[in-house]
Amino acid sequence: YEKKAKAKGLIPLYSVVYGQAGGAMAVLASLSDFSFMENKDGRLFLNAPDAVKGNKNDDFAKAKAQEEAGNLDFSGTEEELITEIRKAFSFLPANNEDEAYNEDVEDNLNRAVDGFFTMPAREALSTLSDEGEIYEVRRAYGEGAVTAFLRLNGQTVGGIATTGEALHWKAVVKMNRFLRFCNSFSIPVLTLCDTPGFESGRCNEM
């Protein structure tokens, strides 16, 4: 735990869960910046699933529940995980002293975009990015905001876009986590804000 905690903010931390990751292993996964899990046999849990009251179908430890709880960036087949992890590597620096990732591109940074201000958040970020490619994180969590890495003129940029809905606290947590990562690795951030404010309710107030 100590070594991984000390590495936080110095190098990007990745966790990949292919089978059972319980107790201490689940805590280690939660310390990572990016977490992935195989969606058939993968399980992520602090306590044995049968120790949780009402958890008859082992739902809490499965990929869908863990994605919705914000503990995973992506779940899929083994082949899909490999593709997704390689995509993450292509956008992100190796450490916090790495120069901003740049690559040669032919896409025009100054191209016109029709209907941009009426686009859904995810589509707007994709439209801005070189060749329309983005790498989205925590997609199933805090759905009032989209957090993704994109490229502008070959340089990796962090993108945050709100969806036009009132913000729930989960979306705020998601954006804050993303911003802290970008700050640690000197990644510039582009923000597209379209929201009427914050949801009303006890959870948001507390």
Regions found by a protein language model. Give the residues of each.
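Cleft-lining beta-strand/loop regions that shape enzyme active-site pockets
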Residues: 1-5, 14-16, 148-206
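Conserved catalytic cores of soluble enzyme domains
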Residues: 1-97, 195-206
